Amino acid sequence: MDFNLNDEQELFVAGIRELMASENWEAYFAECDRDSIYPERFVKALAEMGIDSLLIPEEHGGLDAGFVTVAAVWMELGRLGAPTYVLYQLPGGFNTFLREGTQEQIDKIMAFRGTGKQMWNSAITEPGAGSDVGSLKTTYTRKNGKVYLNGSKCFITSSAYTPYIVVMARDGASPDKPVYTEWFVDMSKPGIKVTKLEKLGLRMDSCCEITFDEVELDEKDRFGREGNGFNRVKEEFDHERFLVALTNYGTAMCAFEDAARYANQRVQFGETIGRFQLIQEKFAHMAIKLNAMKNMLLEAAWKADNGTITSGDAAMCKYFCANAAFEVVDSAMQVLGGVGIAGNHRISRFWRDLRVDRVSGGSDEMQILTLGRAVLKQYR
């Protein structure tokens, strides 16, 4: 495997550097984090560069650039301090609709290309069904030629402002043999109530509880095949976990570089703290973790481009990178000392964000469970 960037990938990465140097984005990110605001202006700038077209097939006007290119872009954005967790729907969100959606649904979502606006997200998790997706209670019921949605969802990302969500629900007419189907829901419909939740981190992307009270849908609002909900979201979970891991790496790399610059400038006892062996030890361990993360992610991206990536690969990336990145940021914060915890340094935001990522997108424990099963399956 050769992970040297080709000319097209180098061009994208150079464009990212140019964009990030064009203004003081950090001040904007700090404001958005403080006020829990989606950084639409920044995402629009990325969309105008074509970031939201990276994985769209050429026949649909996309770049079909592949996952190694996505990885290179994500890593560089993260290294430069960008909150890439707000971008999870950009590389793959359009493709999901091209595969599963009706033409009407596709047209509605594709209209968001190049805008930077939030467009849709999945609504799966419920108060009584987190990792145990099979315990979903939200139902759809057919009556008089219509479909009615009832139930509640929680911890749904981006849902404060997205105009559409794809809701997984079970067939109310089949209680003994659960049938899970997804529905494309316009958030302006009567009977929908959205309650925004506060979070420790990842504050630039909303998190909400949503209730559905006799929300009326049509058969044409079904998303994908009847009863195919589980199969569809399994692929989405793998995709999301890979992107979360990329975000973790980029954030950790940014914290590492911030701390390294500080260690080479901060003077105590007559010399820079970077000359002290205890500080050097921290950087040695941080560098080892960062190198391991990077190689794991690039291998996974290569597998994705070659059609060989598995759920075990995605779980391995998510678990290892979420934990290793948090350890790197925590060590970097220790190097920064009071500057990292009492000032307005961005590392405090990174620390909060990475702690959340060990729960969101699939908890550490679920990644270990998925990975353990995948490993043993190879030897049956």
Swiss-Prot record:
Q: Which reaction does it catalyse?
A: 4-(trimethylamino)butanoyl-CoA + oxidized [electron-transfer flavoprotein] + H(+) = crotonobetainyl-CoA + reduced [electron-transfer flavoprotein]
The subcellular location is: Cytoplasm
An MF annotation (GO) of this entry: acyl-CoA dehydrogenase activity
SUPFAM superfamilies in the cross-refs? Acyl-CoA dehydrogenase C-terminal domain-like (SSF47203), Acyl-CoA dehydrogenase NM domain-like (SSF56645)
* Cofactor annotation: FAD
EC identifiers of the protein? 1.3.8.13
Q: Which InterPro entries match?
A: Acyl-CoA_DH_CS, Acyl-CoA_Oxase/DH_mid-dom, Acyl-CoA_Oxase/DH_mid-dom_sf, AcylCo_DH-like_C, AcylCo_DH/oxidase_C, AcylCoA_DH/ox_N, AcylCoA_DH/ox_N_sf, AcylCoA_DH/oxidase_NM_dom_sf
In terms of domain of life, where is this protein from? Bacteria
Q: In which pathway does it act?
A: Amine and polyamine metabolism; carnitine metabolism
Sorted alphabetically, the Gene Ontology BP terms of this entry are: carnitine metabolic process
* Keywords tagged on the record: Cytoplasm, FAD, Flavoprotein, Oxidoreductase
Family, according to the entry, reads as follows: Belongs to the acyl-CoA dehydrogenase family.
The entry's function note states: Catalyzes the reduction of crotonobetainyl-CoA to gamma-butyrobetainyl-CoA.
Name this protein carries in UniProt = Crotonobetainyl-CoA reductase
Instruction: Tell me what organism the protein belongs to.
Output: Salmonella arizonae (strain ATCC BAA-731 / CDC346-86 / RSK2980)
